[in-house]
Amino acid sequence: MKQYLQLCQRIVDEGQWVENKRTGTRCLTVINADLEYDVANNQFPMITTRKSYYKAAIAELLGYLRGYDSAAQFREIGCKTWDANANENSAWLNNPHRKGEDDMGRVYGVQGRAWQRPDGSTLDQLAKVINNLKNGIDDRGEIISFYNPGEFELGCLRPCMHTHTFSLLGDTLYLTSIQRSCDVPLGLNFNQIQCFVLLALVAQITGHKAGKAYHKITNAHIYENQLELMRDVQLKREPFASPQLKINPNIKSLNDIETWVTRDDFEVTGYECHEAIQYPFSV
């Protein structure tokens, strides 16, 4: 929690204004932020200086791991975060590749589970990584990338957190996640929860201990219409201790994740927080 607040304060103190053409809203921006999450000691990185939610973030991650390409699929598992980008993004609405209401196109999990090869076949990056890790293999390329510039026009949004690299040292598994852009007041709570859960979950289904998850953000920003709430409200609050996460121990395979796991198989305990803050979202 402390590192989150330090990043927010850094943006307020040192950030430079950048015009964002996609949203039409200016951002106060810094370059390069490095965060880390102690998964081994179960220090769950959920924001405590405002009321935050974790189940939608986990549901979104499950949708990515399943390769979902429709906002309707995400809604069915308890996540509404793709409704706006699928149905209110003017550039995507006018894109001839859009297949209709709720279509997201070839974004995030589609790339992770069905990366197009030149011969027309697809590569399941996630399955490759899981199979290697289950067999104790780290080829220094246990990487899942959602970032496919050749297909950006086929999706509603370029991936923000785009690359996840797993590293195995002995029986301890580590994760390094790279993010090109982060809406810190709104998006980072989701992102850091997903980094933590991704490592914890993959460690569980591959039979390893979880170590640390490292999270590198290139462009960290606060939108102009969020600044006052961040500076004058959230940063004035004292954080509470980190909560802990419980994962259903019956989740033992990628097939389990694909077939029956829900957001209710994850439970946060010991969460204390301040009152909610309603930050505006820029589409």
Curated annotation (Swiss-Prot):
UniProt subcellular location: Cytoplasm
Known pathway: Pyrimidine metabolism; dTTP biosynthesis
PROSITE patterns documented for this protein: THYMIDYLATE_SYNTHASE (PS00091)
SUPFAM superfamilies linked to this entry: Thymidylate synthase/dCMP hydroxymethylase
Keyword Aminoacyl-tRNA synthetase: no
Main location per the UniProt record: cytoplasm
Catalytic activity from the UniProt record: dUMP + (6R)-5,10-methylene-5,6,7,8-tetrahydrofolate = 7,8-dihydrofolate + dTMP
One GO BP: methylation
One annotated Gene Ontology cellular component of this protein: cytosol
Residues that coordinate or bind (6R)-5,10-methylene-5,6,7,8-tetrahydrofolate: 183, 282
EC number: 2.1.1.45
NCBIfam families with a match to the protein in the record: PRK01827.1-4, thym_sym
Function: Catalyzes the reductive methylation of 2'-deoxyuridine-5'-monophosphate (dUMP) to 2'-deoxythymidine-5'-monophosphate (dTMP) while utilizing 5,10-methylenetetrahydrofolate (mTHF) as the methyl donor and reductant in the reaction, yielding dihydrofolate (DHF) as a by-product. This enzymatic reaction provides an intracellular de novo source of dTMP, an essential precursor for DNA biosynthesis.
Family note: Belongs to the thymidylate synthase family. Bacterial-type ThyA subfamily.
Known partners and oligomeric status: Homodimer.
Protein name stated in the entry: Thymidylate synthase
Gene field: thyA
